[in-house]
């Protein structure tokens, strides 16, 4: 998948985030990125916190293993997830 790659022993994910959705879920690829809908609003970092929590649970890693590399205030985000491969991340999120 174009939205996931291995880099330095971790998976790097390119995401497109839609805050204030009806529920939190991964909905598929959009513009070369994995689109994730978040129920949280984009206020005071709530959407970023919800994204980290969603990815940690979905990928079976600790929240501390999920780091936002780029896109703190935008919809297009790059996230690094330690302790998992890109292939495992794709399998967990694309299903």
Curated annotation (Swiss-Prot):
Alphabetical list of SMART domains matching this protein: DUF167
Alphabetized Pfam families for the sequence: DUF167
SUPFAM superfamilies referenced in this protein's UniProt entry, alphabetically: YggU-like
InterPro entries, sorted: DUF167, YggU-like_sf
GO CC annotation terms, alphabetical: cytoplasm
Family affiliation: Belongs to the UPF0235 family.
Protein's name in the database: UPF0235 protein AnaeK_1146
Species annotation: Anaeromyxobacter sp. (strain K)
The organism's taxonomic lineage, starting at the top: Bacteria, Pseudomonadati, Myxococcota, Myxococcia, Myxococcales
């Amino acid at each position: 998948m174009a939205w996931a790659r291995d880099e330095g022993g971790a998976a790097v994910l390119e995401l497109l985030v839609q805050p204030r959705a009806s529920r939190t879920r991964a909905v598929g690829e959009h513009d070369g990125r994995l689109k994730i809908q978040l129920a949280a609003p984009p206020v005071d970092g709530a959407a970023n916190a919800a994204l980290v929590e969603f990815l940690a649970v979905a990928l079976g890693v600790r929240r501390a293993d999920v780091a936002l590399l780029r896109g703190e205030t935008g919809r297009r985000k790059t996230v690094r997830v330690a302790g998992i491969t890109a292939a495992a991340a794709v399998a967990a999120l694309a299903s």
